[in-house]
Design a protein with these regions (language model features):
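Helical element adjacent to the flavin cofactor pocket in flavoenzyme catalytic cores
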Residues: 36-86, 90-94
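Flexible loop residues that form catalytic
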Residues: 74, 100-101, 201, 229
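Rossmann-like flavin
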Residues: 1-49
C-alpha cells in the first residue's frame, strides 16, 4: 500500500484503511500486497452481497449434490484411505479436510496454523431506520471497524416490523460501548435499540503475511488434501478457491 499511503494519505487514512481493516480484521499494512490487491479487485469487479437466508445457504448449496452426507459426527483421526469418527470408520481413496486451520493441524501432521485474527459482532433491532441506504459505515476513530443496516440488504434478517443493525469490532467490547459507538456512527440515540445477539469469534480470519503464497499446495500425503481460507486468501472466495483446487487435483488423478 506504499503508493496509496504516499500519493493519497488522506484518502488512505480516512477511507481505505478503515474499510480494509474490516476486511482483513487487522491493519492492512501487514497483509501481503498481492493478496490485498486481489481482494480489492473482487470488490471492484462485483457487487458484494449476502445470502437472503443467511450464510448457511452456502453450506446447503455445497451439500445439495452430495449423495451420502453424514452430519453431527466428530472426526477423531484421518489416515490413508480412512476417516475415524465417534460413530465409526469410513474408507475413501481421497480425503479432503476442509476445516479451520487448528482442527486441520490436530488431525494431520504437516499442517501449519497461521496467525489468526479475532472479531466481535453485535446485532441490534430498532424500529427507527438509521439510513435508507445499503452502504457500509466506517470510521477511522471508532472502536468499531464498521456497521451496516443489514436488513436494508436483506429484509429477512430483521425481526418482524423492525430493522437489524450489525456492528463489528476487532476486540471484545461491552454492549454499552457498542451502543455509544453506534450512536456516533449513525448520529442517533441507540439506547432504545433492542439487543439481539453477540458473536465473539477468536479465530475469525487467518493472517496472510508478505511472502506467503496465494494458493498453497493442498496435498498433504497419501491421498489426503486440505482446503480452507488458510490455504489461499483470507476470504470466502479464498476458501471456495482452495476447495476447488483440491477437488480439481483429485479429479485429475481419478481420470
Amino acid at each position: 500500500f506504499g503508493d496509496y499511503t504516499t500519493s493519497f494519505p488522506t484518502l488512505y487514512e480516512r477511507v481505505l484503511k478503515p474499510f480494509l481493516t474490516g476486511v482483513f480484521l487487522s491493519d492492512p499494512k501487514i497483509i501481503a500486497a498481492d493478496v490485498a490487491q486481489e481482494i480489492l479487485r473482487s470488490f471492484v469487479k462485483s457487487l458484494p452481497g449476502i445470502p437472503a437466508g443467511g450464510v448457511g445457504q452456502f453450506s446447503q448449496a455445497l451439500a445439495a449434490p452430495v449423495r451420502n452426507l453424514k452430519l453431527n459426527e466428530r472426526v477423531e483421526s484421518v489416515a490413508k484411505d480412512k476417516v475415524i469418527t465417534n460413530s465409526g470408520q469410513y474408507s475413501a481413496k481421497f480425503i479432503i479436510v476442509a476445516t479451520d486451520p487448528t482442527t486441520a493441524a490436530q488431525l494431520l501432521t504437516g499442517v501449519t496454523i497461521p496467525k489468526m485474527f479475532e472479531s466481535t459482532t453485535t446485532y441490534f433491532a430498532t424500529s427507527e431506520l438509521p439510513t435508507d441506504g445499503k452502504n457500509l459505515a466506517i470510521s477511522s476513530n471508532s472502536k468499531l471497524v464498521n456497521s451496516i443496516v443489514i436488513s436494508q440488504v436483506s429484509a429477512k434478517y430483521a425481526p418482524a416490523g423492525q430493522h437489524l443493525v450489525s456492528a463489528t469490532s476487532l476486540f471484545p467490547v461491552t454492549e454499552s460501548v457498542f451502543r455509544k459507538e453506534l450512536a456516533s456512527i449513525w448520529q442517533m440515540n441507540t439506547q432504545q435499540w433492542q439487543y439481539v445477539a453477540n458473536y465473539q469469534i477468536k479465530q475469525s480470519l487467518p493472517a496472510h503475511l508478505p511472502g506467503q503464497s496465494k494458493s498453497r499446495n493442498s496435498f498433504v500425503a497419501d491421498g489426503i488434501y486440505v482446503a480452507g481460507d488458510h490455504m489461499a486468501t483470507p476470504s470466502q472466495q479464498g476458501a471456495m478457491k482452495s476447495g476447488y483446487l483440491a477437488a480439481k487435483a483429485i479429479n485429475q488423478l481419478m481420470q
